[in-house]
Amino acid sequence: MTRGTEEQGSAWFRDQRDYWWNEDFLALLAQRWRLCDVESLADIGCGLGHWSRLLFPYLSPDARLLGIDRRLEWIQRARQSFDDAYPTPVAAGKVAFQQSDATALAICSDTFDVVTCQTLLMHLAEPFDGLKEMIRITKPQGQVICVEPSNLFNMMSFDSLTPEEDTETLVKSFEFWLRYQRGRIALGKGDISIGELLPGMFAQAGLTDIRVYLRDTAFPLYPPYADPEQSATLEPTHAWKTSATGPWDYDQVRRYFLAGGGSATMLDTQFSTLREQSQRQRRALSEGRYSAAGGAIVYLVCGRKP
């Protein structure tokens, strides 16, 4: 399965993704990866095509691109976004999309110069199987490029309200999210911090010339919270809470937390703490005294197929 069912809603493709990458950093990556020489690229688990749409201008002029996702809805929307952005290559048949499972790709071996994914492996029950499929369809001497987060770190990043929290509360918060993460893994929903494991997985799979980079983007928040990027950063938190989705989906969080060895008592205590923290954040935002540097660990790992 390319993505767990709970992670398939449009809530996971919000406007904040439009701010994930700085243009000058993308140009640097394109130079490092020699994308100007790439004549074929496959984006596995492409979703709405955010990632491959950014890479496409850096490929060779006649390059062909294939986006693959398990969900037909995402493929249709990705095709439309490419048609809007690059109508001439799309009309010329240089861009195509295919519905397929990331762990069983309906593609011949040794087909693409570059095979890439963004936040795909973190959702797979068997991420190594997904990586092996990516390698299989990569040409010899081609590149595999994966973009994946370390979300346990990201969940624990500090902000201007952290000094108000006592040490015990912060320790319990770490335990809560650690058990949540381990429960997800135990239930086959994926490892949300898989970025930390990618270099070892690449080596185990036989890739060479392995390189690891960090995304250079942060999502700072500071008064008066007026620019579009800050609005896009705040919007998912509000939307998840009002719709009881994502980290505010109590039933889902309960399943993961208990599967990670947590107790029902601790779950209710921590969920209550989360609500209190959310209320404090809203008050601080309304009073113009909330700020955060907005750092997030996202790894870009590339390797070459022998």
For the regions a protein language model found, what residue spans apply to each?
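C-terminal helical/coil "lid" or tail adjacent to the Rossmann-like core of SAM-dependent
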Residues: 2-12, 213-293
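Conserved alpha-helix/loop element of class I SAM-dependent methyltransferases that forms part
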Residues: 19-39, 54
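Class I SAM-dependent methyltransferase SAM/SAH-binding core
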Residues: 40-44, 48-104
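A short acidic, Gly/Pro-enriched loop at the edge of an enzyme's catalytic core
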Residues: 103-115
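A short SAM/SAH-binding and catalytic strip from SAM-dependent methyltransferases
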Residues: 113-128
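A short glycine-rich, Lys/Arg-flanked "PGG" loop and its adjoining helix->strand segment in the class I
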Residues: 128-143
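Acidic carboxylate diad motif detector
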Residues: 146-148
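Conserved catalytic/acceptor-binding region of the Class I
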Residues: 150-247
